Amino acid sequence: MKAPSWRRAVLKVGSALIAPDETGVSTKYLLPIARFINECRERGQEVVLVSSGSVAAGRKHFNFEHKKVPVAVRKAMSAVGQNEMMGYWSRFFDSPCAQLLMTHSDLRDRARYVSIKNTLNRLLEHDILPVVNENDALATDEMKVGDNDNLSAMIATLVDADALFICSDIDGLYDSDPNLNPDAKKIPVVEQIDESIYSLAGGSVSSVGTGGMRTKVEAAEKATSHGIDTYIVNGRKGETFESLLQGDIPGTLFRRQSDPISNKKHWLRHTLVAQGEILVDEGAEKALIENGASLLSSGIVDVQGDFDRGDAVLVRSANDTDAIAKGICQYSAHELMHIKGQQTEDIAEKFGYSPITEVIHRDDLMILEDS
């Protein structure tokens, strides 16, 4: 079985390949990856590199023997390690490399999201290799994506990539844990990601990075829902990249969905973090799901959480615990508590101001039912 062709790809390199023994950057696994990227670019294909490993690369400069390191020291490790890591990547390519460090808050803000997209597109147009990483030196917990598997999926969506390659020290997805079962079989192709696939993912098998197989499956779900074929491959094996260049599938391919969601809907669903919930009645639920309507104040039963205008919220039926939609709210939680259940035309008369007609406009709403 041959791999689907692609024009633009995101390639994520895990910490276990950057600094396998945590004594600084090693070229052992990076050179074959760099050769693969060079070959792809010579063929006219575009690549965005998402490179983990700044903390692992910088660890050698600090006197910490154990894995548990204070947060402030990890940030310092990241600061020095990122510089070393970029130095290596820059030496591997004839054309320039560009460093982009970002946090989840950069991706959650729509204006910054679009700005990052434009910057990446301009870099690719000028044959410059973008090297992306999370800004571990500055990010706080609430600002972090948390792992570069999911970050790579967000970047792949942002640049409208055709393929996402997640390179780690894992051969792919298996039908059971290969560390426990010597007869475990690798799954070459996954057509649909569901709970059965997540049940196979288990936990992390890398001693260096923050992501395991589950985060890779999460990333694959994000990417495939936007029409991006996603591969999990072993970057420690040089033959992996020879196989990819020949159009073969050396790891596990998660096939793109045939009906991908739009870039904005994907951003709503997978990037924005919900700050509260809006409970709606049966009439509003039906209007949202069956008619693709906007959410109006008259259908709101209750409001939970403390959110501001422009925040993302979940919408769920007052009779169920499962969320039915996610969207950007045009009112704060405090404002909604005063207008919930009110007809739009009654709000102006009662409160003395002309209201925004839609609490959540349908263009800012993503239905989650059956997701």
Swiss-Prot record:
GO biological process terms, alphabetically, are:
L-proline biosynthetic process
Classification via SMART domains: PUA
The compartments listed are: Cytoplasm
**Do you know which CDD domains this protein is assigned to?**
AAK_G5K_ProB, PUA_G5K
Q: Identify the residues that bind substrate.
A: S52, D136, N148
This enzyme's EC code(s): 2.7.2.11
Q: Which UniProt keywords apply?
A: Amino-acid biosynthesis, ATP-binding, Cytoplasm, Kinase, Nucleotide-binding, Proline biosynthesis, Transferase
Recorded GO cellular component terms are: cytosol
Per its record, what are the GO molecular function terms? ATP binding; glutamate 5-kinase activity; RNA binding
Where ATP binds, per the record, is at K12, S168, D169, T210, G211, G212, M213, R214, T215, K216
Q: Name the pathway.
A: Amino-acid biosynthesis; L-proline biosynthesis; L-glutamate 5-semialdehyde from L-glutamate: step 1/2
Its catalytic activity?
L-glutamate + ATP = L-glutamyl 5-phosphate + ADP
Q: Does the keyword Amino-acid biosynthesis apply?
A: yes
* Domain PUA intervals: 275-354
Q: Which family does it belong to?
A: Belongs to the glutamate 5-kinase family.
The protein's job, in short, is:
Catalyzes the transfer of a phosphate group to glutamate to form L-glutamate 5-phosphate.
Name of the molecule in the record: Glutamate 5-kinase
Q: Which gene name does the record give?
A: proB
